[in-house]
From Swiss-Prot:
It is found in: Nucleus. It comes from Schizosaccharomyces pombe (strain 972 / ATCC 24843). Pfam families: Ran-binding. The modification Phosphoserine is found at residue 441. This is RanBD1 domain-containing protein C584.03c. The keyword NADP does not apply. GO terms for molecular function: GTP binding; GTPase regulator activity. Residues 522-551 are annotated as: Disordered. GO terms for cellular component: cytoplasm; nuclear envelope; nucleus. Residues 1-309 form the RanBD1 domain. InterPro entries: Ran_GTP-bd-rel. Its main location: nucleus. Keywords: Nucleus, Phosphoprotein. It comes from the Eukaryota.
Length: 551
């Protein structure tokens, strides 16, 4: 859905692209680890040279990793400046993976005991050493091209976080991930963070093929009126890749407790989205900006693929899903799991207070379960889910804990790839109303009755946009043109004219105001004629002032 991607990219949304595969840092570290394992069984004559080349390769990978990861993420964001450079990055990535496989096979190969064993081992050592030097040479040749590509594109690697970052939600999400990683055993999926209650939307299939519907119109359909969303860390044995250790998935399950009629044979909709398949995350401050006309609250929009093979083709279709946080809704106890999920729902302040009181967590959970209300208060907001997705996707891509990653790498997954900012508090956002005379925003698809909404510029303060007048682009252009013409005429005028225009106007209310008013009657507004007595008194005062000046 290119039109939806275009709309979401130019609306008041906050978009982040995720890398398609494991990062280059993970591939490089894996290659170095395999080389280290191989060196231990290599011949004594070749160990020193292999160790020296391995050190050079490791340092070079560490240096170029930030630049390569920046190019990978920016190229996913449809940045045309990185299209050609992305091919070079993919080639380096493939060379590193191929080298890792070769070293791995050589490390596990066993030679039969014979007189030729030393000769065979020597040949393998020579082959590994030659491949390491070739890979090091390729990386050295690619460094100037990577530097040139980043410089010309204007992209930069910065460790500073966006001003709109909600640090409380970010730290809370990191705390949930850390506790889940500590408790993870590797046998069963483990929930990360609390349970979210959402409403999901999907795009109507094949709507663009209809001859009665415009191709630029994106039509949404409510999929799950009440959705129970949970983030899980998946065990390695359930993953396709054997090298993957950290993997997360977002589980979406429909709840029939939505005050709607459902058939007896109807089954709830369930969906599991692996974060390895998520390509782009959009955070919109209003669903209207994504053409969800009935949604005025913040919305998360995910673009993902069904699996890795499907997304490998450029023409492969992508799936879209919109997530809206539900207000305070009534969810019966049966919708929740047992005490372990209730324990996860305990806030950090509650856990600290119970620890000071000496109350065990299990006892508190039992009390909480017995008196659990039918209405859930203080539900986790959509921002917390957003940060959970971002941080879990980062761990899944780098195969490292967030606590071990540098600031620059974390900042890449928390920033908008177009450099935009959003208000920290979504409730303070005020979208401009739909006007029929307004045209589509720049870069978006043509306007329609479902998409004629103008997004508030995200660089403006949300408290200063209420009184901004709504003007059409034609009027705005005409006003700007008139101002430019006036400025040009003033610059081309004589110095005396410019000086008179630039000097401040003299105040009419001064000691000589009566004389000026008499000499310039045109500046006096039209009013009722004064009485004859007042005119005589005014004339007498003028005569007295003249006599004082000229005795």
């Amino acid at each position: 859905m290119d039109e939806l991607l275009n709309v979401a990219s130019h609306a008041a949304t906050f978009a982040t692209n995720f890398a398609l595969k494991h990062s280059i840092s993970f591939a490089g570290k894996l290659a170095v680890q395999q080389v280290s394992s191989y060196i231990k069984r290599a011949s004594a004559d070749d160990q020193s040279e292999l160790e020296s080349v391995k050190t050079q390769l490791l340092e070079m990978i560490r240096v170029v990793t930030p630049a390569i990861e920046l190019i990978e993420i920016m190229s996913v964001g449809e940045n045309e400046n990185f299209k050609s450079t992305k091919q070079l990055v993919d080639s380096l990535h493939a060379d590193i993976e191929q080298f890792t496989k070769h070293v791995l096979s050589a490390a596990h190969s066993e030679f039969p005991p014979s007189s030729e064993k030393e000769t065979l081992q020597k040949n393998v050592d020579t082959s590994i050493l030659r491949e390491m030097k070739t890979l090091l040479l390729k990386i050295n040749d690619a460094v100037p091209l990577l530097n040139l590509s980043i410089t010309t594109s204007g992209a930069s690697i910065s460790s500073s976080l966006p001003k709109s970052t909600s640090f409380s939600q970010l730290l809370r999400a990191n705390s949930y991930i850390y506790r889940a990683n500590v408790a993870f055993t590797g046998n069963e999926p483990l929930q990360v963070g609390p349970t979210f209650f959402l409403r999901t939307y999907k795009i109507i299939d094949n709507h663009a093929k209809s001859g009665y519907i415009s191709n630029d119109l994106v039509m949404w359909k409510e999929e799950m009126p009440v959705c129970i969303a949970k983030m899980f860390r998946m065990p390695p044995q359930r993953l396709k890749s054997k090298d993957t250790v950290l993997a997360y998935a977002l589980s979406l399950k429909q709840s029939f407790d939505d005050d709607r009629y459902h058939d007896e044979d109807e089954t709830p909709v369930t969906k599991t989205i692996s974060l390895n398949d998520v390509r782009t995350l959009f955070f919109s401050l209003s669903g209207k900006l994504l053409r969800l006309d009935d949604v005025q609250t913040p919305v998360l929009l995910l673009k993902y693929a069904d699996d890795e093979t499907e997304y490998s083709s450029n023409t492969a279709p992508s799936n879209w899903i919109a997530l809206e946080a539900l207000p305070l809704v009534s969810i019966p106890n049966e919708s929740l799991d047992e005490s372990d999920e209730l324990a996860e729902s305990l806030s950090d302040s509650e856990a600290a207070r119970l620890q000071l009181l000496g109350i065990k967590k299990q006892e508190s959970v039992a009390k909480k379960k017995s008196s659990f209300p039918s209405t859930i208060k203080d539900q986790p907001n959509l921002t917390l889910l957003e940060y959970l997705i971002r941080l879990c996707a980062l761990e899944s891509t780098t195969q490292e804990s967030v606590l071990q990653l540098p600031d620059e790498q974390i900042a890449l997954y928390l920033k908008d790839y177009q450099g935009r900012e959003r208000p920290r508090d979504p409730a303070s956002y005020n979208a401009l109303e739909n006007r029929s005379e307004l045209s589509a925003s720049p870069g978006s698809v043509s306007s329609s009755r479902h998409s004629g909404i103008f997004a508030t510029p995200t660089f403006l303060s949300p408290w200063n946009i209420k009184n901004i007048p709504l003007v059409t682009p034609e009027v705005s252009t005409r006003q700007t043109k008139n101002v430019d013409e006036e400025d040009s005429a003033l610059l081309m005028a004589s110095p005396s004219v410019r000086k008179s225009n630039l000097l401040p106007q003299e105040d009419l209310i001064s000691k000589d105001s009566v004389i000026k008013l008499k000499e310039n009657p045109s500046v006096i507004p039209h009013s009722e004629p004064e009485s004859s007595s007042k005119v005589i008194n005014c004339q007498a005062k003028l005569n007295v002032e003249k006599e004082k000046k000229n005795p």
